[in-house]
Amino acid sequence: MLLRIANVFSREETARIRVALEQAAWQDGRVTAGYQSAKAKHNLQLAEDDPLAREIAEAMLQRLWQHPQFMSAALPSKVFPPLFNCYTAGGEFGYHIDNAVRQVRNSAERVRTDLSATLFFSDPDEYDGGDLVIQDTYGTQRVKFAAGDMVLYPSTSLHKVEPVTRGARLASFFWIQSLVREDAQRTLLYEMDQAIQQLTADVPDHPSLVQLTGTYHNLLRRWVEV
């Protein structure tokens, strides 16, 4: 399931973050890539211990843990601390699949990468190229969302970032370990949860809502890993 999570940050918040990122100390992005991925990666990145990166990452996680759509779709167990990248002057990242497990810096904690996420801080009209191209079961998907919006997709997906030929593409990227590791199961649970929420708004007293909600939780209980 590929999903757009809209308005994680408002336009005003995104503009302030973008100004701060434009003045940040960027470094070679290959430092966080695996052996194979490093061959295809040509971008800039903030150091994981950069104070600005940590500040924005903390704000992102606070916002996401309160975002109903994200919580419903991702069913997060662990979230790898968000990283930040910049593509400019021909920067690109060729086709690759994200590493299955990520080690949190200066920690024994490991995160299984069930879901990948990119939160955009540049609007599409601010740069040319830079499309996130994702190959999934429905074919090739091209993603270039508004600043403040986020894309969520399975980490098993082959994907790339096309060369940026004008301007700069600023974004955050990170990974989620879900309580439910299989994408098909997460998708079914998400669709059922969305239907329950809509029915609750439309016919809040319908007796079938209790049964449907019970079925959701019984499926979650069957598939969840805690």
From Swiss-Prot:
Top-level EC class as recorded in UniProt: oxidoreductase
GO BP terms: DNA damage response; intracellular iron ion homeostasis
Cofactor field: Fe(2+); L-ascorbate
PANTHER family: PKHD-TYPE HYDROXYLASE YBIX
Ligand binding (2-oxoglutarate): R169
Assigned keywords, A-Z: Dioxygenase, Iron, Metal-binding, Oxidoreductase, Vitamin C
Cofactor note: Binds 1 Fe(2+) ion per subunit.
Residues bound to Fe cation: H96, D98, H159
Signal peptide bounds: none
Annotated protein name in UniProt: PKHD-type hydroxylase PST_0995
SMART domains: P4Hc
Biological classification of the source: Bacteria, Pseudomonadati, Pseudomonadota, Gammaproteobacteria, Pseudomonadales
EC number: 1.14.11.-
GO molecular function, one term: iron ion binding
NCBIfam families in the record: PRK05467.1-3, PRK05467.1-4
InterPro entries, sorted: Oxoglu/Fe-dep_dioxygenase_dom, PKHD_C, PKHD_hydroxylase, Pro_4_hyd_alph, Pro_4_hyd_alph_FE2OG_OXY
